[in-house]
From Swiss-Prot:
It comes from Synechococcus sp. (strain RCC307). Belongs to the MnmG family. The gene is mnmG. This is tRNA uridine 5-carboxymethylaminomethyl modification enzyme MnmG. GO terms for molecular function: flavin adenine dinucleotide binding. Disulfide bonds: none annotated.
Amino acid sequence: MEPAALPTESFELIVVGGGHAGCEAALTAARLGISTALFSLNLDRIAWQPCNPAVGGPAKSQLVHEVDALGGVIGRLADATALQKRVLNASRGPAVWALRAQTDKRQYARQMLQLLQHTPNLALREAMVTGLETSGSAESGDLRITGVRTYFGSIYNAQAVVLTTGTFLGGRIWVGNQSMPAGRAGEQPAEGLTEALQALGFATDRLKTGTPARVDRRSVALETLEEQPSDAHERWFSFDPEAWVSSEPMSCHITRTTAATHQLIKDNLHLTPIYGGFIDSKGPRYCPSIEDKIVRFADKDSHQIFLEPEGRDTPELYIQGFSTGLPERLQLKLLRTLPGLEQCVMLRPAYNVEYDYLPATQLLPSLQTKRVAGLFSAGQLNGTTGYEEAAAQGLVAGLNAVRLIRGQTPVHFPREGSYIGTLIDDLVTKDLREPYRVLTSRSEYRLVLRGDNADRRLTPLARELGLIDARRWQIYERKQEGIAAETKRLETVRLKVSDPVAPAVVEQTGAAIKGSITLADLLRRPGFHSNDLVRHGLADGELPVDVREGAEIDVKYSGYLARQTQQIERVQRQGQRLIPSGIDFYSITTLSREARERLTAAQPLNLGQASRLPGVSPADVTALLLWLELQDRQAATTTLARP
């Protein structure tokens, strides 16, 4: 009998994969004092941004703020490496404000690698993990991870393992009808790990995503295109001023598809992997290829395309909104149908990548797998898309792996408390069969779950868990004290109709002042903001912007916030609310069509079960709760009316 192989090394935690999920998981564990090893196929591609070199955007920026509030690093690095920043949806309410940063992808990766290399308790290893070492058995209910095995036969012991393999499991890239094994362009896929998971009883499936071509900016007539500069007032992802690094911004540019673009695509749809039938994996709904846009939105004669720089020391431009599966020989011709790109040089072709993933219904809310104790999964492996979603999952998986190792209870993030909670709740309860991205519409609590208050919601928890240090805690306390003081001032200081600035305020707001008015009530008037108070000499312009805006939001939306907080508490209480049998869900017109179908088929016993059905959104659950309460009131009224 051959003796068991001796382990090459032993760690408390092993993280497999060096993308955005893996980096957050490894850093979280190491900072909590756990002996951690991060394994990557290529240490020169740590935290690489293979698709859009950008961080943030709608709902994604809220995730980044939340990760930062919990001590994560994606926001700090985005602030340090930003080429430009813009606040999206700035004309709308604070619930949907979204900071987006175009980042220098090479600088981002370099800074992450340096951070990993200088973090105590963290080791980096370049190797392909192909197997999972376990003890016990599924039959006896004590199946547990004990380590990993690499391609060349080395065994590394660990008490817990976090898998963050991205698009590398069974990865295959496609350009037209040509394909090759790869996790992304120029990098080999991971072999063996999918089979190792399947051997342990896990179900796996395939997804796909894509990335557009890159062109040489020196070959593009940028001067003929609409310029999109950075916002004049710089905003930050991180709540830590030490992470704020200002640098000369770079502009993006905008072009549009033409009739020639659309015709070329229509004539060659059969040559793309999806429409040609070469692959049938589902791609991301909210990041469609240009051929998908033209097929799905046939009534539109043009689509907006953004030209975005990839870094300060590279001429490459990322062609956002123009991913394609067309053959390489047609891609340059397609690019040259765009205004400003008539003479462009294509440096890298667009491609699709198909990969294995682990449906996340096989996970607990801690992101530990249900089948194997000590085995966690995070990031694109769980069926998500986006660096931000990956970073959030990585932090949660790393944190809970530490707590498992130490015999502590896992930390669960409820969906009503954060977008992180919304993300994880959707992943582990809904049968998702396409790449998942976070959206503000996925949360019924978006007015409460804003980016600006992520620290208020999560930093006390981070302090309790040891994720942030005393300096960060002091920064948090100073900010909250400042907001409380300014809110109190706004609620008590009054502007009198006889005050010198009153006429200017009345002219701006278009509403008279009857005697006097508090500054808080002024802010509640449409179109009047804290900047206006400063302009009229009614607020201190030296007060930090985050303090002024935090106080403004608290007073301006106090009624809405109170109602949403009550709604959160009501839904929490009603999780076990029984649903009477025999309900005709089709008669409840406030439910979506899909929710009516799912509820009718499943006949859930309570609201908690209803909320976990695929296709039943949080808004549907709220609508069902309100309908049940209405039935209760009507029944009570009927009872009272009886003689």
